[in-house]
């Protein structure tokens, strides 16, 4: 008989010794692993985009050998994003595979490069390929395209993805060659359809021995699988994990509309950022400005698109940037007539430091998009412009080195992270919703709060950013970047950049500054910033609270010129001046009359020539100021007393020889009183001061911006000393009446 025979008495022994080889001549040994130098990665790139450089960087990290086809060629494969095409890639593969057709031991891995990153190395790829036990393995997809009519021709798959994806495949060189040699179409024909027809042909599939990576062990296509793939940190490494199949794919492909998700994974994979080491690529390809003799030329685009609080300070910050002024040019678009006075004051200062300043005012009636296009052109059309730095007026840059830091990071587009104080609102989005608007990425809060520090590839950034001049003159040379459908200008810019394949980065490696809230900025007053204590408390404090205020609690600078009369710094010069200006602009001083309809009962026993905070709509601001800044001092000087921070009477008093020069002795209707000097004795007026009669103690040289704090009723009978000439202003509150 033909075949092999086994004697009955030896059957048991044979089964024990060779349980899987009942026939002589069968190979019982596992196949030896393929050496990593026998793996060749092939990709196609007719241009070197940001995505290509990221792909090559990940390949270099794992020591892949990569052959790039098509470099320097014109792309004739169609618009792969929105239509069929890609045949040029198959034609190039056909040409190159002829050189490897007889190398039986060579494994060829083809993958896209613009939207692919490696998450594992050659050894892992080859091990998984061998385990698949086929000659060629294609990436698998849950979505059938481009011809859905071919669904019935696919083999049935009970577990895993059923359809082929041409974005990645791996196989022995002779077998890959057999596939691509069948190509006889045009460069703009569809590569996906070509490979699909090879696979669904049962004879070809079996003859070449092709399978799909059904469970995404090697290739992970993200389109249609967004909910399957998560970021995983384990053993000091970052991987993308398919939670449906419990696999760790090696090549991650952000095909179709999933490029934003791929960018998110690319921030971590392969080990770009880990929990143990933080950002491992932050110093990659950076530049050192301290080593250059001449700094790059920067055009700064400034945009004032709505009434904005604290604008003079914003403009002054531009002049304090740590950057050579001779290398700067300024483009300013001001949409608001309200701010023209601020622009004029700034220009008169800046023109002595910055040679080129272009101002486009509200009379031009430009839309925001038109203005931003003009600002970008200000750099684009200047061959000497190395960088374009766009800054909106609602950005507070507290780091003078911001511009240098961004340039040194050496990215095409990069923004510094700025947030609203105490909030998660920032100038970037970590993800987009399906309709292209805000969605919160998994890492957004950690980035905003500084728990993860690095340089992050993001889909949207705004308010403040730096763009390379050569990028504006190459990939982004279209003038109308800020106009797109009905999108806001910032969203239009970001969408255009994404579609051009230009990565946008946000850096939180340093503290750069913050964002102002402009939503409720009321410009009906004379000094409108005074009302910003709720919307922008940090900025309000910086502008209006005395810089020595914190020393009250750290250096014990509170003075006591009279018994239980405490004296401390509270207001800045600007606060004093603006409060006086506001009252004078309002102008309805009471005249120091006893009959006063503003108070309960309509009669004031000891009247002053004053204006109440309530009259200028400043009452709520003033009471909040008392709770935030006066109450802590109260607790320090009147130990054990906790103020409610409430006052019925809050007002600015005006003393002058012509109207009211002094105030007779009286007790205040308060538990304690604050009395803040708003101008300077000796400069603005002579005389004045306060005398506490019971202690025979006078204070005749009040300091501007400093406050007295003393008990009100019962103990501290006092009087206002005569003003001899000039005008004296004080702000008074009767607290806890």
UniProtKB/Swiss-Prot annotation:
Keywords for this protein: Dioxygenase, Disease variant, Endoplasmic reticulum, Glycoprotein, Iron, Membrane, Metal-binding, Osteogenesis imperfecta, Oxidoreductase, Phosphoprotein, Signal, Vitamin C
Catalytic site: 728
Residues of the signal peptide: 1-25
Modified residues (Phosphothreonine): 320
Assigned EC number: 1.14.11.4
GO cellular component: collagen-containing extracellular matrix; endoplasmic reticulum; endoplasmic reticulum membrane; extracellular exosome; extracellular space; Golgi apparatus; rough endoplasmic reticulum membrane
Catalytic reactions on record: L-lysyl-[collagen] + 2-oxoglutarate + O2 = (5R)-5-hydroxy-L-lysyl-[collagen] + succinate + CO2
Pfam families: 2OG-FeII_Oxy (PF03171), GT_PLOD (PF25342)
Residues bearing PTM Phosphotyrosine: 323
Main localisation: endoplasmic reticulum
Subunit details: Homodimer.
Protein name: Procollagen-lysine,2-oxoglutarate 5-dioxygenase 2
Species annotation: Homo sapiens (Human)
Gene responsible for this protein: PLOD2
């Amino acid at each position: 008989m033909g075949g092999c025979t086994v004697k009955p008495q030896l059957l048991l022994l044979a089964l024990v010794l060779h349980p899987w080889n009942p026939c002589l001549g069968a190979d019982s040994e596992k196949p030896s692993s393929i050496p990593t130098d026998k793996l060749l990665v092939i990709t196609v790139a007719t241009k070197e985009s940001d995505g290509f450089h990221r792909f090559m960087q990940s390949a270099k990290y794992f020591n892949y050998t990569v052959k790039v086809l098509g470099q320097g060629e014109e792309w004739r494969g169609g618009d792969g994003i929105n239509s069929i095409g890609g045949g040029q890639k198959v034609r190039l593969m056909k040409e190159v595979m002829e050189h490897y057709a007889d190398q039986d031991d060579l494994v060829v891995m083809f993958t896209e490069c613009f939207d692919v990153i490696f998450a594992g190395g050659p050894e892992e790829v080859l091990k998984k390929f061998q385990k698949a036990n086929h000659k060629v393995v294609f990436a698998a997809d849950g979505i059938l395209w481009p011809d859905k009519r071919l669904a019935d021709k696919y083999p049935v798959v009970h577990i895993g993805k059923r359809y082929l994806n041409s974005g990645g495949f791996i196989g022995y060189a002779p077998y890959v060659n057999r596939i691509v040699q069948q190509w006889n179409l045009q460069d703009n024909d569809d590569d996906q359809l070509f490979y699909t027809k090879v696979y669904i042909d049962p004879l070809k599939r079996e003859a070449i021995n092709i399978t799909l990576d059904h469970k995404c062990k090697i290739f992970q296509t993200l389109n249609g699988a967004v909910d399957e793939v998560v970021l995983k940190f384990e053993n000091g490494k970052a991987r993308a994990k398919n939670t449906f199949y419990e696999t760790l794919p090696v090549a991650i492909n952000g095909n179709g509309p999933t490029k934003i998700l791929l960018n998110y994974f690319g921030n971590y994979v392969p080990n770009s950022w880990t929990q143990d080491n933080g950002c491992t690529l932050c110093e990659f390809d950076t530049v050192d400005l301290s080593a250059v003799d001449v700094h790059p030329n920067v055009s700064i685009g400034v945009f004032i698109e709505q009434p904005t609080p604290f604008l003079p300070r914003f403009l002054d910050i531009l002049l304090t940037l740590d950057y050579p002024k001779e290398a700067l040019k300024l483009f300013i678009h001001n949409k608001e007539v309200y701010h023209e006075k601020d622009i004029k004051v700034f220009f008169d200062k800046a023109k002595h430091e910055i040679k080129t300043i272009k101002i486009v005012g509200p009379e031009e009636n430009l839309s925001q998009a038109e203005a931003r296009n003009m600002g970008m052109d200000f750099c684009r059309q200047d061959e000497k412009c190395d960088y374009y730095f766009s800054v909106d007026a609602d950005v507070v840059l507290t780091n003078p080195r911001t511009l240098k830091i961004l340039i040194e990071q050496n990215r095409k587009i990069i923004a510094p992270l700025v947030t609203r104080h105490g909030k998660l609102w920032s100038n970037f989005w970590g993800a987009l919703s399906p309709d292209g608007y805000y969605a919160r990425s998994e890492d957004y809060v950690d980035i905003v709060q500084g728990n993860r520090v690095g340089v992050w590839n993001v889909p949207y950034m705004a308010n403040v950013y730096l763009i390379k001049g050569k990028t504006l003159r190459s990939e982004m040379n279209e003038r109308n970047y800020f106009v797109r459908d009905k999108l806001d200008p910032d969203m239009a810019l970001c969408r255009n950049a994404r579609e051009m394949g230009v990565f946008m980065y946000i850096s939180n490696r340093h503290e750069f500054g913050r964002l102002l809230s402009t939503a409720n900025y009321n410009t009906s007053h004379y000094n409108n910033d005074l009302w910003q204590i709720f919307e922008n408390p940090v900025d309000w404090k910086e502008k209006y609270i005395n810089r020595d205020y914190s020393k009250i609690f750290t250096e014990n600078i509170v003075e006591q010129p009279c018994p239980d009369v405490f004296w401390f710094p509270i207001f800045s010069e600007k606060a004093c001046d603006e409060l006086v200006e506001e009252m004078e602009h309002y102008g309805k001083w009471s005249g120091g009359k006893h009959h006063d309809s503003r108070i309960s009962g309509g009669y004031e026993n000891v009247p002053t020539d004053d204006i109440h905070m309530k009259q200028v709509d400043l009452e709520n601001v003033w009471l909040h100021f008392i709770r935030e800044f006066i109450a802590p001092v109260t607790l320090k000087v009147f130990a054990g007393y906790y103020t409610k921070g409430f006052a019925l009477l809050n007002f600015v008093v005006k003393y002058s020889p012509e109207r009211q020069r002094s105030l007779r002795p009286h007790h205040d209707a308060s538990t304690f009183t604050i009395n803040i000097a708003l101008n300077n004795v000796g400069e603005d007026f002579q005389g004045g001061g306060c005398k506490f009669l019971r202690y025979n103690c006078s204070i005749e040289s009040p300091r501007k911006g400093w406050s007295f704090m003393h008990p009100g009723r019962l103990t501290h009978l006092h009087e206002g000393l005569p003003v001899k000439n000039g005008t004296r202003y004080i702000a008074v509150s009767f607290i806890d009446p």
